């Protein structure tokens, strides 16, 4: 049973421990039994509008023993993160509770124009002027830190806006990527497990696959979904949102028949998004392959890139090769369609990860002149397929081999 399988129990709050003003069935008794059994308990919440003391007090009013230090809130975790990043002065785009967590962490709350970091939380009094001030300061070099990226939460009359709406507005206007602290991002979970030696004995309980389950899996711990309704599931066993077990409520921790599948992290990071991509294989008259050394990561690789709006994949690869090498090409055939996340998830220097579904084409040169350097390229040259340069993007030698195999059918990998 789950009680015996783990020593450290992490819990989301809303939808797992309580809903509104009421504790969920079995929650009070389950947490009491966990404590009497010597288990470590942590409560995780993305809500930045309550201090840890307030959250612990709310749990105690429901009959659930909880200490401040057992609460890991996105507001408190953000304050810890700012202290680690040595951002002494911060502008808080949030309410007085987030400001208090920052002050308690030794941070100075300052006017936006003097801030080393801008912290995005939430306040019902937030204005467009506040958001514009944050945009300007971040665009001018201040750190961009977000308590979480939740878009909305359920309200009495429908969805209510949450932190993620402000974060996205600032991101789009400033052109800067935020560091996000709360679930499903790793920092908050690491804070919860800060003094835990064996993470394999830790488990997360949540009701949201995208935040609770995926977040736990991103740091390599098991995750259990609380759900009493129909579950449609996820088709891939490697989907980070797929729970290791599903239970209706916390009384199931002592179910003798329940077994949990231990989470084995896949060989790729969980992507933030998925995009269509293209790659092109161009050869010279000696059968050598055209490669470019990318400016963004210093690796050699095939000419490649994104599909723009309004483009076909054929148009996209012709454009990419022209922009990156100066050559004009025509598409000869489709070599393969590549989507396996183990080779197709690419992590950028800012930490963002994208999964590409890449159409790889065999192309021939019909014009243009080779340009060896540019905004995206450090060098461009032809290489024998048996003597590819190093370092080279991991998946590209496989694509080259597929093209040289002269298969008449498109390859799917």
From Swiss-Prot:
GO CC terms: cytoplasm
Keyword annotations: Hydrolase
Motif (Nudix box): 305-326
InterPro entries: HAD-like_sf, HAD-SF_hydro_IIA, HAD_sf, Nudix_hydrolase, NUDIX_hydrolase-like_dom_sf, NUDIX_hydrolase_CS, NUDIX_hydrolase_dom
Name the UniProt record assigns to this protein: Uncharacterized 45.4 kDa protein in thiaminase I 5'region
Record domain Nudix hydrolase: where: 273-406
Keyword Hydrolase: yes
Source taxon at top rank: Bacteria
Organism: Paenibacillus thiaminolyticus (Bacillus thiaminolyticus)
A Pfam family this chain is assigned to: NUDIX
GO terms of molecular function: phosphatase activity
């Amino acid at each position: 049973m789950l009680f015996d399988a783990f020593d450290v129990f992490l819990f989301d709050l809303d939808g797992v421990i309580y809903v509104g003003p009421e504790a969920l069935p079995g929650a009070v008794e389950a947490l009491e039994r966990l404590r009497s059994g010597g288990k470590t308990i942590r409560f995780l919440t993305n809500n930045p509008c309550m201090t840890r003391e307030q959250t612990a007090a709310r749990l105690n009013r429901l009959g659930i023993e909880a200490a401040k230090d057992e609460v890991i809130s996105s507001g408190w975790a953000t304050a810890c993160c700012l202290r680690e990043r040595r951002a002494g002065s911060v502008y808080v785009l949030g309410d007085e509770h987030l400001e208090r967590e920052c002050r308690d962490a030794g941070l100075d709350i300052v006017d936006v124009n003097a801030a080393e970091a801008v912290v995005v939380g939430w306040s019902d009094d937030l204005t467009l002027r506040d958001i514009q001030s944050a945009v300007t300061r971040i665009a001018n070099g201040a750190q961009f830190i977000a308590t979480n990226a939740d878009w909305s939460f359920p309200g009495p009359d429908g969805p209510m806006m949450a932190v993620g709406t402000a974060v996205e507005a600032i991101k789009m206007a400033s052109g800067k990527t935020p560091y996000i602290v709360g679930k499903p991002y790793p920092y908050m979970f690491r804070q919860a497990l800060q003094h835990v030696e064996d993470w394999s004995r830790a488990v997360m309980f949540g009701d949201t696959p995208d935040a609770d389950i995926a977040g736990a899996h991103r740091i390599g711990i098991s995750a259990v979904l609380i759900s009493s309704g129909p579950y449609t599931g996820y088709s891939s066993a490697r989907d980070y949102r797929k729970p290791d077990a599903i239970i209706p409520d916390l009384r199931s921790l002592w179910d003798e028949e329940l077994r949990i599948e231990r989470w084995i992290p896949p060989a790729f990071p969980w992507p933030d998004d998925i995009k269509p991509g293209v790659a092109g294989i161009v050869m010279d008259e000696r059968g050598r392959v055209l490669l470019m050394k990318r400016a963004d990561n210093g690796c050699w690789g095939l000419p490649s890139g994104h599909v723009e709006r309004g483009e076909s994949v054929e148009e996209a690869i012709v454009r990419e090769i022209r922009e990156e090498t100066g050559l004009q090409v025509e598409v000869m055939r489709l070599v393969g369609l590549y989507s396996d996340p183990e080779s197709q998830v690419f992590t950028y220097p800012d930490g963002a990860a994208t999964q590409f579904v890449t159409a790889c084409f065999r192309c021939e040169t019909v014009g243009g002149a080779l340009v060896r350097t540019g905004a995206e390229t450090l060098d461009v040259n032809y290489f024998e397929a048996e003597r590819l340069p190093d370092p080279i993007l991991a998946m590209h030698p496989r694509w080259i081999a597929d093209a040289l195999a002269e298969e008449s059918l498109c390859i799917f990998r």
